[in-house]
Amino acid sequence: MAGFGLPNFGQLTEAFKKAKEIQQNAQKLQDELESMEIEGKSDDEMIKVWISGNQLPLRVEVKDTIAESNKEEIEKNILEAIKKAHETSTTTMKERMNDLTGGLNLNLPGLDNNDS
């Protein structure tokens, strides 16, 4: 029996094991997110963008026929594609983090667990 409201040694050891496991898996997840290529495209598919699971821009593809569009339409399509890629990437990252932590509410910066 632990005194002074402290957990017993077994519970403490188990908590440290779990923390170490999460830390190791977090590094694997970081590597996985870094190597992901997530696509976002405009509704008319004139513009496609790819970003990593860490939301870093990777590349852009523009159809030849985009030259027939006006400036405002091109800008709208670029923004649309970026937003879709970012949303998918962010959702993927949150899901993977949730899987990693087993649904623990860790309140990690940038990952509002209440968004899901």
From Swiss-Prot:
UniProt-listed SUPFAM superfamilies: YbaB-like (SSF82607)
Superkingdom of source: Bacteria
Biased composition (Basic and acidic residues): 89-98
Subcellular location as annotated: Cytoplasm, Nucleoid
Subunit structure: Homodimer.
Function (record text): Binds to DNA and alters its conformation. May be involved in regulation of gene expression, nucleoid organization and DNA protection.
NCBIfam families hit by this protein: DNA_YbaB_EbfC
Similarity-based family: Belongs to the YbaB/EbfC family.
Protein name listed in UniProt: Nucleoid-associated protein P9515_00191
Organism: Prochlorococcus marinus (strain MIT 9515)
